[in-house]
Amino acid sequence: MNIEQKQKELDLTYYWDAPIYNFYVSYFGDETIIEYEDDRKKYWRVTFLLCGKVEYTTDALWKNWRDYNVKSLKKTQLGYSAQNFTLLQYVQNKNFVECRIDLGGLDITIVCRDIQIEHLELKDAQFFWQDNETVE
C-alpha cells in the first residue's frame, strides 16, 4: 500500500470535525471500521483490513465524564468527531501501516496491511443509534 497516497485519499474525505456514526472491530480484530458523516445523503466508511493490532481508549475513564452506555444514545448525543487520521510506516514490519486516529473522546491505534475507503448512500445504512431515534 502506498501510505502517502492513502493519506491523501483520507484527507480528501474532509473528515475534520465530521460526526462519527460508528466504530467497530470485527472478525477477531481482523477488520476495524470507522464510519463518519459526509453530508445529508452520503457517509464515509473507512475499513482497516488484515489488522495485526487494534488499541483504543475511550472517554469512559475520564473523571466525571460519562456514566451511561453509548449504545443507548441518539445520533445527536454521540459527540464523537473526526479530528485526525495519521498514517505511518509501521517500524516493526514494512508491509504494515500504523494508523493513529483521534475521534475526540476516542483515541485509536491500528496496525494493518490495507485500508479501504468507501463513499456510501446514507439511506441504505444501518447504525446502532437508529434504534434509539424517535419517529415523529
Q: Model-predicted segments: where are they?
A:
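Surface-exposed, interaction-prone regions used to assemble/regulate multi-protein complexes
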Residues: 1-136
